[in-house]
Structures are given as C-alpha cells and as structure tokens.
A protein has these predicted regions:
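A structural signal for short, well-ordered beta-strand segments and their strand-loop junctions
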Residues: 31-33, 105-108, 145, 153-156
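Double-stranded beta-helix
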Residues: 149-174
C-alpha cells in the first residue's frame, strides 16, 4: 500500500476515534464497532475457553459465586485472553486518545460469560465503577464483546455519568 494512502487511513481512523470520544463524553457511553477483527475475536474466544476449561468444576463454582455471570476469580484478569484483548492496537489507540497520553496502565477486572443453557433469571445490577469520592472523569471502563449479545447484555444509562457527583453527594460520600 502506498505510504500516502496508509497515512490518510491512519488519520481517518484517528479522527473517527476522536468522534467516538466526543460521543462518550456527551452520553456517558459509546459503542465502537469493529475494534477487533474477526480473527482477533476468534483468538480471544479460543484463549478464554482454553483457560475456562482448564479449571475443574469452574462452571459450578462460577454459577454459585457470581449471580451476574462475571468471572472475578482464578486470576482471570491476568490470563492469556485478557492480555491478548488489552494489547490489541486499536484498543490501545482508543485509550491513548481518551487519556491523551502514551503512558497507559490498564487493569482487567473480570470477564462475563453466561452459557446458552443457563436458566437463571437475570437481575439488574445497577452500579458505577468509579469510586464514589472521585470527581470528574477518573474511570473509563471498556467492554469488548466477543459474541452477538442478543440474549443478555450490558445495560447503560444515557448521561448517568453527569449525575455521579450529585448522587454520591446525597449519599454523603463527599
């Protein structure tokens, strides 16, 4: 590919990321499609199931320990699938632009998996990941979907980020 064309593509991708960040700051969330290629999604799923299937009785423990489908145990955030996802170039680029820095430190607190044969009734789990006493934008959480998520999914409340400080002030966290 011609280097001029390649530079234009990089510039266009950069501008698109900036547009998504503008939407994030306005609405409190944004959906960015195609952050991972199909090949990267397949690799991440392969690595996840390799880890998941390596732990005896994990499904039984998981269904008992967490009613929301979130894996928080067995060092999930340090497994190969977690590192694979967080080191993808597009993900890194998004967070570089979001925080306006080249120096990133990231965490991966868990992952969500609910098998198709799960019969548990879903319950809302409304919460915020930003600490109650923090003001302004101090926490951005990414969610990388490896499936279509047409049965269960993440729920976000548009512009709820604008109520964070006021809500916790009323709860006397400040």
């Amino acid at each position: 590919m011609d280097s001029e064309i390649e530079n234009r593509i990089i510039l266009l991708e950069s501008l698109i990321i900036e547009l998504y960040i503008t939407k994030l700051r306005e609405y409190g969330y944004v959906v960015i499609p195609n952050v991972l290629t199909d090949t990267e999604v397949d690799e991440a799923k392969t690595l996840f199931f390799k880890w998941k299937n390596s732990i005896p009785d994990l499904d039984k423990f998981h269904n008992t320990a967490d009613p929301h489908g979130i894996f928080k145990f067995h060092q999930v955030g340090h497994q190969e699938h977690a590192w694979f996802i967080r080191t993808r170039p597009k993900i890194i680029e998004i967070f570089k632009k979001l925080w306006e820095t080249e120096e990133l430190v990231v965490s991966f607190d868990g992952c969500c998996y609910i098998p198709k044969n799960c019969t548990k009734k879903d319950k809302l789990w409304t919460h915020t990941d930003q600490a109650p006493c923090n003001k302004g934008e101090t926490c951005f959480q990414g969610f990388v979907a490896l499936t279509k998520n047409d049965e269960r999914t993440l729920i976000v409340y548009e512009k709820s980020h604008l109520l964070h400080e006021e809500y916790f002030k009323k709860k006397k966290y400040y």
